[in-house]
Amino acid sequence: MEKVSYYTEEGLQRLKGELTQLKSEGRAKVAEQLSEARDKGDLSENAEYDAAKEAQEILERRIAKLEELMINARVINKDNINTSAVSILSKVKIKNKKLGKVSTYTMVSEEEADLKEGKISIESPIGKGLLGKKAGEVAIVEAPAGKIEFEILDISF
């Protein structure tokens, strides 16, 4: 059994929507591509058929992954979150001690992470380093380029 994953209501609904779309529209599109490729004759030398089969495999793997996530997904109740330390759904303002750069991130599940929206995964190196820390503390994060120190300036929800 996979581990339980926690999501915001919005994030879980987005994943459910993706699953529904893939099962209906995605499968229909791939079935149409397979049918068109079959109509072109000999399947042993049919690149379109091979491409459609590969697309089908990728689609089915994503559907299976989303279905597994749904089984183990839980919506986060904000009332049960410790607001004194960094946790999932925390909005964290941090300062890179070496560069002096200040950034704000929201801590989310791996599937909801989107750096462009300022959402980082609690499973990422930075996320793991920040979890459980309090405002004023320094988190040391192991990154490919070496250790990075982040000072936690503020935590909000």
Curated annotation (Swiss-Prot):
<dbReference type="InterPro" id="IPR018151">
    <property type="entry name" value="TF_GreA/GreB_CS"/>
</dbReference>
<feature type="compositionally biased region" description="Basic and acidic residues">
    <location>
        <begin position="25"/>
        <end position="43"/>
    </location>
</feature>
<feature type="coiled-coil region">
    <location>
        <begin position="43"/>
        <end position="79"/>
    </location>
</feature>
<keyword id="KW-0805">Transcription regulation</keyword>
<feature type="region of interest" description="Disordered">
    <location>
        <begin position="25"/>
        <end position="47"/>
    </location>
</feature>
<dbReference type="GO" id="GO:0003677">
    <property type="term" value="F:DNA binding"/>
</dbReference>
<keyword id="KW-0175">Coiled coil</keyword>
<comment type="similarity">
    <text>Belongs to the GreA/GreB family.</text>
</comment>
<dbReference type="GO" id="GO:0070063">
    <property type="term" value="F:RNA polymerase binding"/>
</dbReference>
<dbReference type="Pfam" id="PF01272">
    <property type="entry name" value="GreA_GreB"/>
</dbReference>
<dbReference type="GO" id="GO:0006354">
    <property type="term" value="P:DNA-templated transcription elongation"/>
</dbReference>
<dbReference type="InterPro" id="IPR022691">
    <property type="entry name" value="Tscrpt_elong_fac_GreA/B_N"/>
</dbReference>
<dbReference type="InterPro" id="IPR006359">
    <property type="entry name" value="Tscrpt_elong_fac_GreA"/>
</dbReference>
<dbReference type="InterPro" id="IPR028624">
    <property type="entry name" value="Tscrpt_elong_fac_GreA/B"/>
</dbReference>
<dbReference type="InterPro" id="IPR001437">
    <property type="entry name" value="Tscrpt_elong_fac_GreA/B_C"/>
</dbReference>
<dbReference type="GO" id="GO:0032784">
    <property type="term" value="P:regulation of DNA-templated transcription elongation"/>
</dbReference>
<keyword id="KW-0238">DNA-binding</keyword>
<protein>
    <recommendedName>
        <fullName>Transcription elongation factor GreA</fullName>
    </recommendedName>
</protein>
<keyword id="KW-0804">Transcription</keyword>
<dbReference type="InterPro" id="IPR036953">
    <property type="entry name" value="GreA/GreB_C_sf"/>
</dbReference>
<dbReference type="Pfam" id="PF03449">
    <property type="entry name" value="GreA_GreB_N"/>
</dbReference>
<dbReference type="InterPro" id="IPR036805">
    <property type="entry name" value="Tscrpt_elong_fac_GreA/B_N_sf"/>
</dbReference>
<dbReference type="InterPro" id="IPR023459">
    <property type="entry name" value="Tscrpt_elong_fac_GreA/B_fam"/>
</dbReference>
<comment type="function">
    <text>Necessary for efficient RNA polymerase transcription elongation past template-encoded arresting sites. The arresting sites in DNA have the property of trapping a certain fraction of elongating RNA polymerases that pass through, resulting in locked ternary complexes. Cleavage of the nascent transcript by cleavage factors such as GreA or GreB allows the resumption of elongation from the new 3'terminus. GreA releases sequences of 2 to 3 nucleotides.</text>
</comment>
